[in-house]
Swiss-Prot record:
Designated name of the protein: PHD finger protein EHD3
Pfam families: PHD (PF00628)
UniProt cross-references to PANTHER family, sorted A to Z: OS02G0192300 PROTEIN, PHD FINGER PROTEIN EHD3-LIKE
SMART domains (UniProt xref): PHD
GO biological process, one term: regulation of transcription by RNA polymerase II
Annotated region described as Disordered, given as residue ranges: 1-46
Subcellular location: Nucleus
One of the record's GO cellular component terms: chromatin
Naturally occurring in which organism (per UniProt): Oryza sativa subsp. japonica (Rice)
Main location: nucleus
Length: 563
């Protein structure tokens, strides 16, 4: 009985199982690495810019996981999940923790060892064992290639530059689905199909193509933004100044020819600039004065008007550009240069310096490229009185002048400038530093042109390299630059440039009757016609207003006498 009342012995306390320790370790590890609350706190404070772009990065990766293609698994889904588990906000020393994606090489090696040591297998199975070894080696190589591509993609996803790109798309451009812009579905599909496992170089090509697309879009956006900025500024100035489109079209015409007179019009400016005349003659070409209130020139780059204060003028041809347009083409230009030449004149100088044509001879002291000598040739002259009659003084032929000699039987009816050995455009003779280009057509009526008086399109050096000689704009079609069908070439009655009837716009089947004008001269004539119409309207309005004033004065006098 006593033994029955005896209390049971105390049980020994069992130690906790090792599984509890592992659970506690996992729970403690989970508590130490909580990237999302840290990033959320940074976003709420709005003081840590780094946390801002990492939040955009997190949202972008979550968007990738929600994509129907990537959510299938087997592709880059595992890599994205590992990137999300990585906490870039805790990196202080710039050390990136790499996650190694490996296949199961130990398992492969075990299988290989098992095949190599069959332990009692028959000798007839040696051939199948070798095939199994090769398959295992190929599988191991594929797994290694796939792991290498995953590691490379992981490094890209956890980089700060990628996070900044995500923040640019989400925070700046407010792209709802960055996955539509950053196209990873193609890479995911190839990763799932095993293309990268067989050829890992394809992964690098696809990644580079994606970034090159971003670079191209960025460059296009930069160029469009610069152009739109220039157009916006010029459009506002145009609306504020009140100039019409007809005036802009008139200013865009670089060369103009009126019936009975031939002259060159540079970009209009308030100062008339003339080449220094030679000793034997002076220019017989009348100057075109700038009408009052039209001292604004169009930019040769964008075609809109530009004020003299904000423009950049070529020191060779007086062509005006917006400084912003010049800076867009030449980003190295930071401020307005003291001496500047446009691209056309720069190309012309290079062509002259390279002696690309046999008709051009460089025997001047400085080789024809001295900017100072070019500047000294430009002299300011007073505007000629338009009421004075135009007189043509024939220049004496100087020694050494490059004049084409023809037989008397075949001599055509030359123009006054050709008979006087004068330039067709400026009406002055040839000089050491103003050399002639001589038209090689035997029936050319103009013959002589100063090189500096011709535009690059009129010289057409590249188009005439294969021809035996140089043809002027009147003797060679300006549409096709082909030395053929001279009987079908028609010269414009405004600028004397020649065109084949099938090169006209629109093309013709027969030679037009009466006068014919090219496209540029049609625009110029339309602008001149509008100006004449405006002047006639103002004249009629002025006369009627004057008549009304006279009638009102007579009525007031009559009322006074009656009183």
């Amino acid at each position: 009985m006593g033994s029955q009342n005896r209390p049971p012995p105390p049980r020994k306390r069992q130690p906790p199982p090792p599984e509890d320790h592992l659970v506690t370790y996992k729970r403690r590890r989970s508590k130490e690495t909580q990237p999302l609350p840290l990033m959320a706190n940074g976003a709420n404070s709005k003081k840590d810019a780094k946390a801002q772009h990492w939040i955009s990065w997190r949202d972008t990766l979550h968007g990738f996981l929600q994509s129907p293609a990537i959510s299938q698994g087997g592709g880059i889904q595992t890599c994205i999940r590992h990137a999300l588990q990585h906490n870039p906000c805790l990196l202080t020393n710039g050390v990136v923790v790499h996650t190694e994606f490996k296949g199961n090489p130990a398992h492969s090696q075990g299988e290989e060892a098992k095949v190599q040591h069959p332990n009692g297998a028959a000798g007839g199975k040696v051939v199948s064992a070798d095939a199994a070894i090769q398959d295992a080696a190929a599988a191991a190589s594929s797994e290694a290639n796939k792991a290498m591509c995953n590691n490379a993609l992981f490094d890209i996803l956890v980089s700060q530059k990628f996070a900044l790109l995500c923040h640019l798309l989400l925070g700046t451009f407010h792209v709802n689905k960055p996955g539509d812009v950053i196209d990873l579905e193609k890479i995911d599909a190839k990763m799932r199909n095993g293309d990268y496992a067989h050829n890992p170089a394809l992964f690098d090509d696809d990644i580079q193509q994606m970034w090159e697309k971003f670079e191209q879009v960025g460059q296009e956006m930069t160029g469009l933004a610069s152009n739109l900025s220039t157009i916006s500024r010029v459009s506002y100035q145009k609306q504020a100044s009140g100039f019409s489109e007809a005036e802009v079209a008139e200013h865009r015409i670089e060369e103009i020819s009126l019936p009975g007179a031939v002259h060159v019009v540079t970009k209009e400016s308030t100062t008339t600039v003339q080449l220094a005349p030679c000793d034997s003659s002076h220019s017989t070409i009348p100057k075109r004065t700038v009408p009052p209130g039209r001292d604004l020139c169009p930019c040769d780059g964008c075609g809109t008007k530009v004020d003299v204060e904000e423009g950049l003028i070529c020191d060779e041809c007086d062509t005006m550009y917006h400084f912003a347009c010049v800076k867009l083409l030449n980003p190295d230009i930071k401020q307005v240069p003291a001496i500047w030449h446009c691209s056309t004149c720069s190309f012309k100088k290079k062509e002259l310096a390279a002696d690309t044509t046999n008709n051009v001879a460089h025997d001047c002291l400085h080789g024809g490229n001295c900017v100072l000598c070019d500047q000294l040739e430009l002299v300011k002259t007073e505007e000629e009185d338009p009421k004075l009659p135009i007189k043509i003084e024939l220049a004496e032929e100087r020694e050494g002048s490059s004049v084409s000699s023809m037989g008397e039987d075949n001599e055509p009816d030359l123009s006054t400038t050709a008979l006087s050995n004068l330039c067709k455009h400026c009406g002055t003779c040839e000089d050491d530093d103003k050399r002639f280009m001589v038209c090689g057509h035997p029936y050319c009526v103009y013959k002589f042109y100063h090189i500096r008086c011709l535009k690059t399109s009129q010289l057409a050096i590249e188009q005439q390299k294969k021809l035996g000689c140089w043809y002027c704009p009147s003797c060679l079609c300006r549409g096709c630059f082909q030395d053929k069908d001279d009987d079908q070439i028609v010269m414009c009655d405004g600028c004397d440039e020649g065109y084949h009837i099938y090169c006209m716009r629109p093309a013709r089947n027969t030679i037009p009757k009466g006068k014919w004008y090219c496209t540029f001269c049609k625009i110029r004539r339309a602008a001149e016609g509008m100006h004449k119409y405006e002047d006639s309207v103002l004249k009629i309005h002025g006369n009627s207003k004057h008549a009304c004033n006279v009638n009102q004065s007579k009525d007031s006098e009559g009322d006074g006498t009656e009183k």
